[in-house]
Amino acid sequence: MDPVNFIKTYAPRGSIIFINYTMSLTSHLNPSIEKHVGIYYGTLLSEHLVVESTYRKGVRIVPLDSFFEGYLSAKVYMLENIQVMKIAADTSLTLLGIPYGFGHNRMYCFKLVADCYKNAGVETSSKRILGKDIFLSQNFTDDNRWIKIYDSNNLTFWQIDYLKG
């Protein structure tokens, strides 16, 4: 199953979606294993939406299909507590319009997710890089509170059976 249909069918609001693109200007400078992340907001007026932060547009909301344009691989993670995830998804809307960056009053994609979940009561560890605390994909994927529910490179049989109910 492709990631867009998986998310539309199974992912709860607040799921975090990691993607890698076939071509990215920042991928060589980015120490994250997964190069981009967004928060699945859910549906609004029948449209599935993702909140992300990009270097060109800052924090914005985009249709799920647009989020996946040009993607190479995808992973989706969730927490056990769906209510916490909903709070994080709602928080993401309050950050719309913040410019992209690493300084004060700036937001890059992994910080967006970390801040939304911090507001929901879930602290995320960071890495100290060049004197700054930076959030990377590994800060989420290596944290056992996060459950991987989809991996486009490795859809295992137990996941297929689990998803069938």
UniProtKB/Swiss-Prot annotation:
Location relative to the cell: Virion; Host cytoplasm
Name the InterPro entries on file.
Papain-like_cys_pep_sf (IPR038765), Peptidase_C92 (IPR024453)
Pfam families referenced in this protein's UniProt entry, alphabetically: Peptidase_C92 (PF05708)
Record key words, sorted: Host cytoplasm, Late protein, Virion
Q: What is its main location?
A: virion
Q: Which SUPFAM superfamilies match?
A: Cysteine proteinases
Can you quote a single GO CC term?
host cell cytoplasm
Something else the entry says is: Displays sequence similarity with a group of bacterial permuted NlpC/P60 proteins. Thus, the ancestor of the OPG091 gene might have been acquired from a bacterial source at the onset of poxvirus evolution.
Function (record text): Contributes to vaccinia virus virulence in mice but not to replication in cell culture.
The similarity annotation says:
Belongs to the orthopoxvirus OPG091 family.
Name the chain's protein: Protein OPG091
Q: Which organism is it from?
A: Vaccinia virus (strain Copenhagen) (VACV)
